[in-house]
Regions:
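Active-site nucleophile and cofactor-binding loops and adjacent substrate-binding regions
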Residues: 103-114, 132-141, 232, 261-266, ...
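Buried hydrophobic positions in well-ordered alpha/beta secondary-structure cores of metabolic enzymes
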Residues: 82, 101, 113, 120, ...
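Claisen-condensing/thiolase-fold acyl-transfer catalytic domains that form or cleave C-C bonds
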Residues: 264-268, 272, 364-430
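Active-site/ligand-binding loops adjacent to catalytic centers
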Residues: 64-66, 190, 196-234, 254, ...
Length: 455
């Protein structure tokens, strides 16, 4: 029987709506709070930062939200994305399990980030915004937003986390090619950046600091808005096109996953593939596990505290109910820059608290080992972030073999690693250190946040 290695949908089969998990969550998340009053935020609290349509999506409990035609038209350049059966990887492992992966690296940004970048740029343009500010870790989000902003005629200012700015010069150049201005963060351009540099002149930066800088610039100009690449509900909403496509593709393959896996930074790529499958679990009783894999050096889901905390370092965002390591936390300089964030999205946090998803933490070298095996067998060089999902999938296959069972495993290959060659070079030079955050470090970080217990 001929092997079918990839399942490709036609453009006509691409979903026309995003799926909103808030419609089906048994326990809705606690509301974000105004940090000054500790009262739930209203649209007026967010209007200086986000366009109104995205604010509506942030709080919506409608199950499905239509994708605008202009967004669908750009999606068609690279969507639907392919679903692959990893036959060669299965053979290398000698596993009885079936491994599938949804590949999101085949677009202009090289990652899943394009799915929400296009949507956010569109809604900003529709409301008369002229410039957007944003942060980026490893550069995938900045690359995604750069092209989207150029397409819709918007200026873009990107604050790129310093350690990734230095590690990945190609990403900065890619953003420049698409028309964006890129500043290493922390910078002297903002009060938030200057404060960090005064305290820590050699700071490697963090996503929390970069968010603070981008928001500070945005609120100073009525024609400028801020855009976030993960964490928030509307960002996660836009990513659900991944899982909705995967549901159709798995059906075409005549299969259904026992477990769905995604790496975890703020929550967008994991939620994008997992939430449509969680819908099937919640509404139709499907037996499936949903597993996030995060760095052991930044383990907010596995070791963090469920609490109200800021989404940024300077305390400019609302207080969000989430698993957090503390908004002042500066992660270790791992090469998975997109996962170096102190907190978890509100939706994922609530679902983890309620037991609907699972979380695991992995060390850096094990994940790169899995990424190299994947590259050598499947012919795609994974992004360092995606290596965490690969490591999680390998774990599941090996565990199933030890138990004498065959599992169907699906993971999200969120992006390619073509700009991350230096990280792989360090891996082969045995110069890629592991770092596991200790309980003492976590306690110290949480003790420094100086916030009341609002739970």
């Amino acid at each position: 029987m001929e092997k079918i290695r990839k399942i490709i949908l036609s453009e006509k089969e691409m979903p026309r709506q995003w799926y909103n998990i808030q419609a089906d969550m048994p326990n809705k998340p606690l509301p974000p709070l105004n940090p000054a009053t500790h009262k739930p935020v209203g649209p007026e609290d967010l209007a200086a930062v986000f366009p109104m349509e995205l604010i509506k999506q942030e709080v919506s409990t409608e199950r499905y939200i239509d994708i605008p035609d202009e967004v669908l038209d750009l999606y068609r350049i690279f969507r639907p994305s392919p679903l692959f059966r990893a036959f060669n990887l299965e053979k290398a492992l000698g596993t009885k399990s079936k491994i599938y992966y949804k590949y999101e690296g085949g677009n202009y940004s090289g990652s899943h980030k394009a799915n929400t970048a296009i949507a956010q740029a569109y809604y900003n343009k529709e409301e008369g915004v002229r410039r957007i500010t944003t942060e980026t870790g490893a550069g995938q989000w900045g690359s995604a937003m750069s092209f989207a902003c150029h397409h819709f005629g918007l200026e873009l200012l990107v604050f790129m986390v310093r350690v990734s700015f230095d590690q990945k010069p190609g990403r900065k150049l890619m953003m420049n090619i698409y028309g964006a201005k890129v500043i290493p963060s922390p910078s002297t351009m903002t009060a938030a950046g200057r404060k960090v540099l005064e305290m820590y002149p050699d700071s490697p930066g963090s996503l929390g600091i970069a968010i603070s800088e981008a928001m500070e610039v945005a609120v100073q100009d009525p024609y400028t808005k801020y855009s976030l690449g993960s964490v928030l509900n509307h960002v996660i909403l836009h990513q659900t096109i991944i899982g909705q496509e995967a549901l159709i593709q798995m059906e075409k393959a005549g299969d259904y996953p026992d477990v769905v896996i995604g790496c975890f930074g703020g929550g967008s790529n994991f939620s994008g593939i997992a939430f449509p499958f969680l819908r099937e679990k919640l509404l139709n009783g499907k037996d499936i596990r949903l597993v996030t894999v995060e760095p052991a050096s930044c383990p907010k889901l596995t070791k963090g505290k469920f609490m109200y905390d800021f989404g940024d370092t300077a305390g400019m965002t609302p207080l969000l109910p989430m698993y957090s390591l503390g908004h002042n936390f500066i992660p270790d300089k791992i090469h998975a820059g997109g996962l170096r964030y102190h907190g978890a999205g509100v939706l994922v946090s609530q679902l983890l608290k309620d037991g609907f998803i699972e979380a695991k933490a992995k060390l850096q070298r094990e994940c790169f080992e899995g990424g190299v095996l994947f590259a050598r067998t499947e012919g795609i060089l994974p992004a360092p972030e995606s290596n965490y999902a690969i490591a999680g999938a390998l774990d599941e296959a090996r565990k199933a073999d030890l138990e004498g069972v065959s599992k169907t495993i699906l993971f999200n290959l969120s992006g390619h690693g073509h700009f991350d060659i230096s990280a792989y070079e360090k891996y082969f030079e045995n110069n890629l250190p592991d770092h596991e955050l200790s309980s003492a470090e976590i306690e110290k970080s949480l003790a420094n946040i100086n916030l009341p217990d609002l739970m």
